[in-house]
């Protein structure tokens, strides 16, 4: 009889442990899953220039200026390049294009047009930039240049888009939004020129991909 009681007590302790530890294990797993989701997204703010950033972040004017200047450099490296001023203006509007030095590796689709532009290419002015929210204690931050089409017929019209054509909504500075961390990653340098209307086509393709990805994610979460 003593042996039977001992076995029953051991069984009770085993079952009790299983019932009470399982919810804890699930809770821990949930925490790790949530942490994974948090790491994949980043909260960013959209500014037109360093002054906008400084006004929104008092005492951080130096950081705002650094981020703005870095975004300008990134824009020069990654912005869509056009062989002629006319092609650039057709997408981004009069007064919104500037001449950019020819970059190593550039391969204009029309070499004659490139020569007409005196060996230089044309690129849109940076319309704004996306910046990782400033953190206390001098934490690091990232920035990404944004462009905006002035052509009503373009899919990019009135939108903030990055160099790859990804759309981040209306071209209105001062907004805060959540984006994938990949959105803040450096973009590849431009190595070819864009034909007239080509950037708008890139934006349309990216929008289709974004909608498709969102739909797939929703279906997965819904089971």
From Swiss-Prot:
Residues 204-223 have a biased composition (Polar residues). InterPro entries: Biofilm_formation_YgiB. It holds the Pfam family DUF1190. It comes from the Bacteria. Residues 178-223 are annotated as: Disordered. Residues 178-195 have a biased composition (Low complexity). Belongs to the UPF0441 family. This is UPF0441 protein YgiB. It comes from Escherichia coli (strain ATCC 8739 / DSM 1576 / NBRC 3972 / NCIMB 8545 / WDCM 00012 / Crooks). The lineage of its organism: Bacteria, Pseudomonadati, Pseudomonadota, Gammaproteobacteria, Enterobacterales.
